[in-house]
Amino acid sequence: MRPGEESHLVPKEIENAADEPRVLCIVQDTTSCKNINERITLNLPASTSVKQLYEDVSSKAGYVSGTFSLMWGNGASNMVDMAALDPTPDRTLQEAGFEAGKKNFLHLTDKNGEQPQLASDESGTADSSGLDDSTQEKFIGPLPREESVACTSDYVSQNYSYSSLLSKSDTGYVGLVNQAMTCYLNSLLQTLFMTPEFRNALYKWEFEESEEDPVSSIPYQLQRLFVLLQTSKKRAIETTDVTRSFGWDSSEAWQQHDVQELCRVMFDALEQKWKQTEQADLINQLYQGKLKDYVKCLECGYESWRIDTFLDIPLVIRPFGSNTAFGSMEEALQAFIQPETLDGPNQYFCERCKRKCDARKGLKFLHFPYLLTLQLKRFDFDYTSMHRIKLNDRMTFPDELDMSPFIDVEDEKSPQTDSCTDSGAENEGSCHSDQMSNDFSTDDAVDEGICLETNSNIEKLNKSVSEKNSLYELFSVMVHSGSAAGGHYYACIKSFADGQWYSFNDQHVSRITQEDIKKTYGGSTGNRGYYSSAFASSTNAYMLMYRLKNPARNAKFPEAIEFPEHIKLLVQKEQEQEEQEKRQREIERNTCKLKLFCMHPVKQIMMESKLEVHKDKTMKEAVEIAHKLMDLEGVISLDCCRLVKYDEFHDYLERSYEDEEDRTMGYLLGGVKSSYMFDLLLETKRSDQVFQSYKPGEVMVKVYVVDLKTETVAPPVSVRAYLSQTIIEFKQLISKSVDLLPDTMRVVLERCYNDLRLLNVANKTLKAEGFFRSNKVFVESSDSLDYQLVFTDSHLWKLLDRHANTIRLYVSLPEHTPQTARSVGPKGGGDSNLSEDYCSRVKGNVKSVDAILEESTEKLKSLSLQQHQDGGNGDSSKSTEGSDFENIDSPLNEADSGSADNRELENRILPADPENNFQPEERSDSDVNNDRSTSSVDSDILSSSHSSDTLCNADSAPIPLANGLDSHSITSSRRSKANDGKKETWDTAEEDSGTDSEYDESGKSRGEAQYMYFKAEPHAGEGCLGEGNKCLLVSVDKRITLAAFKQQLESFVGVSSSQFKVFRVYASNQEFESVRLNETLSSFSDDNKITIRLGRALKKGEYRVKIFQLLVNEPEPCKFLLDAVFSKGMTVRQSKEELLPLLRDQCGLDLSIDRFRLRKKTWKNPGTVFLDYHVYENESISSSWEVFLEALDETEKMKSMSQLSLFTKRWRPSELKLDPFKEIVMESNSVDELRDKICDISAIPLENLEFAKGRGTFPCDISVLEIHQDLDWNPKVSTLNAWPLYISDDGAVIFYRDKMEELVELTDEQRNDLAKKESSRLQKTGHRVTYSPRKEKALKIYLDGPSNKDSSQD
């Protein structure tokens, strides 16, 4: 809510209307006359006439009466065809059908296809700030008696309509649109505009376009803005052109700054732009004053001084260290010039006395500017809470201010003065500079922006001092509402034209009174202001502007006829541009905008565009526009196209427009609307065809012909029918379109997903069967016996059920490198294409599977193999006769998937051979030990692979296993003895870990054998990810599980399903791994993209872990080693055992199991040491698990969780260097023990030892120039877990030193060289630690335009 405005208008109640029933009317404006959809609520007596209702709506909506219609909106399905309320008969609302005590919904619509006429033709741009009160509901009638939101003004407009929101305020002034947080800019611009002297000078300046770009010219854009503020008929205008001339981009609009800060920066920019022009000294002439900064010796009377200039005077609200604020601005001014005594340690060195003496230091005003600017310093720093605060104390200020008491009139008479070159004054330094100082300075009498004048002219100063007129008149109060964290600025400005005060609050301009000015004094007294309760007391004056009362100098605002010629030309140019915008808005207001669709006659793809056509264009002309818009010129002739009414959501053709080619679009579409409930379709035909007539009431039916023999469903054929038709009539209609016999035709309606209904009652109507606007039916006509079966048992139903659940997926396969090929091919094979000899050798060994399985089971005591398939051929790709499953041969090899699985597993279990060793990048988590017997299978190895479907006999022949073998039952004897002979199952999915599912003998997930439709074929082109990748187009039943889907892909990928991962690709090309094997593909949809990546898929309870090596004394202490797989329930020692061969083969680290440790990794910090007996189930693990591996020089010292491992590093100040890290293990958290441990490893006497905790991330690096002073040495604590140490976990860094060792002294040159080296070192390692909070972005105006913005940055 803005001051002086209220969108809820409440007229006085009629006294005798209390007992009369009232009618609540809610009117929704559905026209497109306005940029917003207005909603008006009227609470009228039931005896009100319909004619009066029209009058009330026209008054409140801002339309001319009689140019719009009101229609019922209570659930009307087709509003356009309903008759409007007739206002001519003298009927009351009750007689017209309005119900008292209920909501009566009405729609305000176009009348006879013509839009309503606005009551005011003078319309401006819509408020782009999003704060327009017109978006609120307007209410007429009695409201509950609640206290309304208070305004800062007693003035409330009684003629408030929509047109007034867009037209110029009745105050005669134009507002400024708030871009986002530019209210501080708006308040200053309005103040400058309302300053006659500034406006007149700006108008006198003439822009030379040949010399400068108008876009980057600040004076020109200000000139344009002022011209628009004076001559525009809009309610508010934009400031984007001005901010663009500042060199600001759109992000600057979201930065809030102080208005006083902006004033200084803008004045500096104008001075730079106005150099060598008539306005070069304008800012100084209007706003600059002078004061004297002096120091006077109290013993000899000698005074040294210098002259400063100022553009504004900063006044402290509350003195530093005081709890009491100044009550008035006069008190603050007196405090500003009140001298302070320099005594004690602050004595002043007097040049005459040649010694330090007591002195008096202060400021004296010598000359006040014509326009006096006073800043009330309401922002301060609270040293108790260490936060910036706003002081909301009450401070009064007069309407007229006499500044004569504050001028030093006796200064020129003082003989004992000296220039500002005095050394004492230089040592003290001026408290005023042209650089911005910190608002949190302890010297609150000091401010920013007062600049030093080194070449002062004494004669001019004496002349200015002699001027007696020092009476100023207040004309601008810039107000801040909010807190130190942020708020809102607006300006209260007194017009010199009529003496009336106005509130300029962004786009809102309203009249206010002197009482409203008093409310800006601050404090908690008085009525609430602009903000409600939360900021009621925080609305107060922040910046004041006074003008000298001098009739000889006081200027008046220029009238239009007094404008200079170049301003008149600018006014004419802006008015023409505004008229052009107005005409464009009028065109927009009469333009129908709809979605346009068209099925391309050649490409057969649905195209979509946006059709914009004037309401007076005919249908024939609209077809020509649509024809060009869809780029069909040269593709199809214009006479083979037409526009029809279309419902894209239901894919339904509602009606065609025969014999209406000469009707206007406004008439056919029901007028111009902001949105339509329908679309348009550009329908095409062949030259030998005739357009079909579409009439309202028809329903669209898409007919799919099913062929049971080929099990195919043909593309749809569109048929239009009537809901009153019977099923037998509907079949006859279909037979004409698809050439099927109606007697044997079966028609199945799909009402919704998976809802198939056989239409077999001949005399039942389509309406009774549940047909709607758009329908989908399947038809089949054959003489097969399938017709006699129950529908749900028939082949037709199964085929349709499969069709409804089949989705199409694009699957990108991994590229097989030579290393990868060795993992899936025969021994020593380096080619990804497997030889046919090898394939036949595999198939030849299938017969002996039972015997070899029995032999292998005897050797593996801890295994229990579950075999569910007789014969053991392992062919998971074959199905029983009659199944819906269809498998396409792999493009990689022609063998079946079972053979591929066997080949892959044979190679994985073949005897170890130097020529067949895994390379680091090709190794899985399984490993074959060379010292094991080749005639048996090590259970430990199999347990880590989880992928073996093949065993090997002593002759190294491959032994294919039945796919029913659950590889998870092959477990390590040390972990799963309790499960010996039992099959492990993983029924429940667990977040962030792998899952598994049970398979039946055909390789399918149990209970889903009937949902195994799978068809894959090579694909190239659209849908494939990346160039060169092999891609499949897969049609699959989405009810199968991910596990079954992966099994079907095995033959195409070339490895077992446990050795590759499935990633789902989203629109933004983000990939997420699908790991829940027992979940179906129901979350996938048509044309989804899938990427297959090689790598062992996780099982339930398993987690992928990134292993990093901790190198404490290296420049980069964190080095990635490898990815490993840990599982819950595994001990730390077991994981170390599994890591040993991986570290040796992949990383070249030959470690002893007792000479390295694992520890927690948090970002780059080493944490808790994992002891060997720890179980990972007790640790907090997730999908992004990272662990440090730390090599040890000796056996592990950490034996218990009660111990604490710390890193210590000695600082040697005499050498400016740090020793390497040394680890100490604490038995307790005692500081005394820490001291003792450090003394033991350093030989420093206990009484000379000092220590400090490192800062930042490990290794807590710090510059050797800073460590001696910046760290908190020798904290006074007794335990490590107390402040400021807070050490309670392993891995903390402790620096220590010998306090008797003195810091080496460096020359300036040595220090600079060392500083450069340290800076370079810390930047390379990335361990530079800074603790400065986020700084506010400085307000800058870039004089060279946006292009040079970056170079202007500090």
Curated annotation (Swiss-Prot):
Residues 933-949 have a biased composition (Low complexity). Its main location: cytoplasm. It is found in: Cytoplasm. Keywords: Cytoplasm, DNA damage, DNA repair, Hydrolase, Protease, Thiol protease, Ubl conjugation pathway. Residues 987-1000 have a biased composition (Acidic residues). Its EC number is 3.4.19.12. SUPFAM superfamilies: Cysteine proteinases (SSF54001). It is an enzyme of class 3 (hydrolase). Residues 114-133, 416-438, 863-882 have a biased composition (Polar residues). It catalyses: Thiol-dependent hydrolysis of ester, thioester, amide, peptide and isopeptide bonds formed by the C-terminal Gly of ubiquitin (a 76-residue protein attached to proteins as an intracellular targeting signal). This is Ubiquitin carboxyl-terminal hydrolase 47. It comes from Xenopus tropicalis (Western clawed frog). The lineage of its organism: Eukaryota, Metazoa, Chordata, Craniata, Vertebrata.
